[in-house]
Amino acid sequence: YPIVIDHSACFNHAFKHMPDLEINDISEFLCKFVVPRLDITKCDERVIVHKQCKIKVLGKSQYIEDLARLCSDHVFNIKSFACDGFAGQKGFFTPELNKVATKDLASEVAEYGATLGVSSSSTCEIGLGESGGIPFVSVAYLLDRCSKAKK
């Protein structure tokens, strides 16, 4: 199996700086290696997907959306910003970055009737949850909630 990194910004750094290693973002790993071994039952959540800016740059953002669509028939992509501004740990020390970047997220959540947000960056999830007014969790938690191992 490849190396799996459960934080997209860290994945981006490792992917760029260690080209000889097979490294997957958590969403890509789950799609390629875990999903085929699962029985998935869709949930009733209305899921809004945060495609972390670093995985978008690498062209790997489709994996998180694919996972969300396996788990729910009601999936929406965030359109009100390209980057949430949390910027790794900077959001802890300069929360204004996140607040300004995500100022329209609560309206977007309300427009879609979203009840849960998913991401692949734990620090982004903190700011997104505060700004959006709904829980944002790792997409791995959503997949776990909607699946069981095939027999």
Regions found by a protein language model. Give the residues of each.
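Iron-sulfur cluster-binding electron-transfer modules in prokaryotic oxidoreductases
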Residues: Y1-K151
